[in-house]
Design a protein with these regions (language model features):
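Residues in and immediately flanking transmembrane alpha helices
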Residues: 15-16, 76, 206
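Active-site-adjacent loops and short helices of periplasmic peptidoglycan-processing enzymes
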Residues: 23-176, 180-189
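Sec-dependent N-terminal signal peptides of Gram-positive bacterial secreted proteins and lipoproteins
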Residues: 3-24, 404-423
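Hydrophobic, aromatic-rich alpha-helical transmembrane segments
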Residues: 1-4, 114, 397, 401
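Domain-terminus/edge residues, biased toward the C-terminal soluble/receptor-binding domains
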Residues: 155-156, 169-172, 176-408, 420, ...
């Protein structure tokens, strides 16, 4: 009898497994490429993915972070900046058989040339040189800055061991993380111009090398005469090592929709070309319009503290947003919650967000995106406690923090008889993105 019951249970489990509704993948299933991720370039919302959190060797798409940090340091002031090539820039690459532009120790290279050499020629010696520029003068310092930026972005599946992407057991990223790294880099002055250049770039002679060097676009998907040409791709970085195989990250735009697409560990080069085309064709066919998500009227109270004392309460609400939803989905398929700290301390960037979550069903990846929430009453609270006129109205945390970060942390309540006498304005930190 027990045996019969066991057999019956087994049959029932099998029947349930066969006829239970299966979760259908929101995007194409790729067999020749291990992992991919497609996000909306504007909000960072994940649209489709396969193994997007798998930690893989990135190869030269590493240089997106290197170039982003160099652009951040330069703040658009490229002209007149000269970098001196060190012994380590050149000889740390000995025996790697990696891409380079034959920089020589002691050579002085304009920053602009180093940027385009690293971007277009995928020069590992150029990446080393740039890492010293935004680090503390050493490659190790540059790598530390890269990992600090990873932490700042809240990414969980990335660690860099070098600025160029030569395979190392401690050097890895994921498709999701790399998509968010590119999204961040695109906000840095000059990066998008660098990333999207198609024309040949001439590097003039230097104080050591008398001949010009020329850098060409290496991505066949951006060459009009190539059979692999994809007009929607605006900018890209390609990567390859024997261990990483083929990796790719691009910015693509069509009919006002901007996407970031990352593929990693494609078996052969033609697999990469074909799979990127498949992914972009899918995305642009299914995502054609942005949808306004109205404010839902969520309200919560948040304690504000300064000078070690509570100052009062402010009101936090969801602001509404605009999301790229798959055709067939509506604002009704999006839910929102508020994400607040225990208290907001003056002098810090307020980590106050509305989290919008898409129920993608079988049409879109179910994913979330964080948007700065709206804070009401902060200026009035400060006026009551400090006597400082900051204006009135409702501000998002990004704008409010820009007014407040410079306020002295020695601010106390009126009962203490102390008022703030110094106020400076500076920009708030960018919010972290997570899926």
């Amino acid at each position: 009898m027990k045996k019969q019951i066991a057999v019956l249970c087994t049959v029932l489990l099998w029947v349930c497994a066969v006829f239970a509704p299966m979760a259908q993948a929101a995007g194409p299933a790729l067999s020749a490429t291990e992992a991919y991720c497609i996000i909306d370039a504007d909000t960072g919302l994940v649209l489709a993915q396969q193994n997007m959190d798998e930690e893989l060797h990135p190869a030269s798409i590493t240089k997106v972070m290197t170039l982003g940090l160099a652009c951040e340091k330069a703040q658009g002031q490229w002209d007149g900046v000269s970098l001196e090539v060190t012994h380590e820039d050149v000889y740390s690459l000995a025996g790697t058989d990696s891409s380079h532009i034959a920089l020589q120790e002691g050579e002085h290279v304009p920053l602009t040339d180093a940027l385009y050499a690293t971007m277009m020629a995928s020069a590992n010696d150029g990446a080393n040189l740039l890492s010293e520029y935004f680090g503390d003068g050493t490659i190790a310092g540059g790598v530390a800055a890269m990992n600090a930026q990873v932490a700042e972005l809240g990414l969980k599946h990335t660690h860099f061991a070098n600025p160029h992407g030569i395979s190392d057991t401690d050097h890895y990223t994921s498709c999701y993380d790399m998509a968010q790294i590119l999204r961040w880099a695109l906000t840095q002055p000059g990066f998008e111009t660098l990333f999207t250049r198609n024309e040949m770039y001439p590097m003039k002679p230097t104080d050591i090398q008398p001949k010009e060097r020329y850098f060409h676009q290496q991505d066949k998907m951006r060459v009009g005469s190539s059979r692999y040409y994809i007009p929607a791709i605006q900018g890209s970085k390609i990567g390859y090592t024997n261990i990483a195989r083929y990796s790719y990250v691009c910015l693509a735009e069509q009919n006002g929709v901007r996407l970031i697409c990352v593929t990693m560990q494609s078996n052969i080069k033609t697999d990469k070309y074909n799979d990127v085309r498949t992914l972009l064709d899918y995305a642009f066919a299914h995502y054609t319009n942005y949808t306004d998500i109205p404010a839902q009227g969520l309200t919560r109270e948040l304690t504000v503290a300064g000078g070690g004392a509570p100052l009062g309460m402010v009101t936090v609400t969801d602001p509404g947003t605009r999301l790229l939803l798959a055709d067939g989905l509506t604002a009704g398929d999006v839910s929102v919650t508020l994400e607040l700290p225990e208290q907001y301390v003056l002098g810090t960037s307020p980590a106050v967000y509305a989290v919008y979550t898409v129920n993608g069903q079988d049409k879109q990846e179910s994913a979330s995106v964080r948007v700065p929430a709206t804070i009401t009453g902060l200026e009035e609270l400060l006026e009551r406690n400090t006597g400082v006129q900051l204006g009135s109205g409702t501000r998002s945390p990004g704008k409010t923090a820009g007014l407040l970060i410079g306020i002295s942390l020695g601010c106390t309540v009126l009962a203490a008889g102390v008022t703030v006498v110094v106020m400076k304005l500076r920009k708030a930190k960018k919010p972290k993105h997570k899926h």
